[in-house]
Regions:
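C-terminal transmembrane helix-loop-helix hairpin of multi-pass membrane proteins
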Residues: 301, 310-397
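Membrane-interface interhelical loops and short amphipathic "cap" helices
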Residues: 1-12, 41, 63-84, 144-162, ...
Length: 399
């Protein structure tokens, strides 16, 4: 059931923001069209810049809308101000893609042969085009879903079928410059400036994926959901095995996601100074929003990003199969260190013994699991790097 709809002020905000931002975008488009003679088509100079800018517009809308859902400040309608930002960006993105696909024969020819233009797109440019199409279809479905079945809250936003379509479409859209540059042998070889589009594309895609898996992220989860203490009421888990299981499940998932996102970048490009820091900064900013602006996340994220950036010589000397495990393990080490500094909020003692087991702060896990969890995260990163960077197979001559 749809429930109660928003009041006049909330509804008024949607058209004002939606059409206002589109008017600004249209004015900028007209300006650059006059300056350049025409806006760039697929594969031309500045095409990837425009696509990424429009994708980031959508991402900002997603972050704002996600915060509204997470904090419970949504109303039971589709037409909210935060949706206006998200969908105005998608409309602008879609309008630009429509322009670049428009054949010389005009709109009538495109209507009669809607798939002809899509067939001619080179493979490296398809994610951006197909992504906004998926996003648009899912957006219409999302409006119908909200107006008939109501608005999701909390973790429900991650499982709404229309939201899943929006997530997939947005990941493809914001990562479009990455796939466009993948086929260009000269991309990303002239320092940080040449890798900015790649960094922003991967970082933005990672932001969406973090939202999809926010239920399994110890940087987001309250510590009482995965800590253990037989002497305190803070921790929700009465059984140690339950606390450890919840924590490990989240660690495994995030270690895999972190490894995968970094492998995409490192498989193709040699990271310039500053690129790894910026990619992880995207991660940090997203988590900051998803935790409802927990400043501790900012501190942890910046420390992690600095450590990874300073460790770049490890990559140059020892390769990705050592560097990626280092990144994944330090992600957990920073979390443990941060909570250990705040250990006074959890218990007066830094350790205690139950039976034959030594339990230590900050999570109350045994010393075996506390140290072993860091090791297993490194192992996950190592296994992922083996898959991402396999040894060259010898040519098989069966004659």
């Amino acid at each position: 059931m749809a429930g109660n709809h928003a009041g006049p002020d909330l509804l008024f905000g949607f058209p004002t923001i939606f059409f206002g931002t589109l008017a600004v975008a249209g004015s900028l488009g007209f300006f650059f069209n006059m300056k350049w003679g025409r806006l760039p088509k697929i594969g031309e100079k500045y095409y990837d810049v425009i696509v990424l800018t429009l994708g980031l517009w959508c991402l900002v809308g997603l972050l704002i809308d996600s915060f509204a859902h997470i904090s419970g400040t949504v109303d039971d309608t589709f037409f909210t101000p935060w949706h206006a930002i998200w969908y105005s960006g998608a409309t602008a993105y879609g309008a630009y893609i429509f322009y670049v696909l428009l054949p010389e024969e005009g709109i009538s020819h495109m209507i009669r042969n809607p798939f002809e233009s899509l067939k001619g797109i080179e493979p490296q440019h398809k994610p951006g085009v197909y992504g906004i199409i998926i996003f648009g279809i899912s957006g219409v479905g999302d409006m119908i879903w909200h107006e008939t079945l109501g608005v999701e809250s909390s973790l429900d936003i991650l499982l709404s079928p229309t939201h899943i379509g929006l997530f997939i479409g947005l990941i493809m859209s914001v990562s479009a410059p990455v796939w466009s540059a993948w086929a260009d042998p000269s991309s990303g070889i002239k320092g940080l400036k040449s890798q900015m589009l790649l960094v922003f594309g991967i970082g933005a895609a990672w932001s969406v994926i973090l939202l999809m898996f926010r239920f399994a992220n110890l940087w987001i989860a309250p510590i009482e959901s995965f800590c253990y203490s037989s002497q305190l009421n803070l921790c929700k888990n009465d059984r140690y095995e339950d606390a450890l299981s919840i924590g490990l499940q989240s660690l495994y998932i995030q270690a895999g996601i972190t490894s995968a996102m970094l492998i995409i970048f490192l498989q193709r490009w040699e990271p310039a100074r500053g690129s790894m820091f910026l990619i992880l900064t995207f991660n940090t900013v997203s988590l900051f929003v998803y935790t409802e602006f927990d400043r501790n996340v900012i501190y942890m994220g910046l420390v992690w990003a600095i450590l990874v950036e300073l460790a770049l010589p490890i990559y140059h000397k020892l390769g990705a199969k050592i560097y990626i495990p280092f990144i994944v393990s330090t992600q957990l080490i920073v979390l443990i260190a941060s909570w250990y500094i705040r250990a006074s909020d959890i218990a007066n003692a830094t350790y205690w013994i139950e039976g034959n087991d030594l339990h230590v702060l900050p999570f109350g896990w045994t010393i075996h699991s506390t140290i072993g969890s860091v090791v297993i995260c490194a192992v996950i990163g190592w296994l992922a790097s083996i898959i991402g960077f396999p040894n060259h197979q010898p040519e098989m001559n069966l004659k």
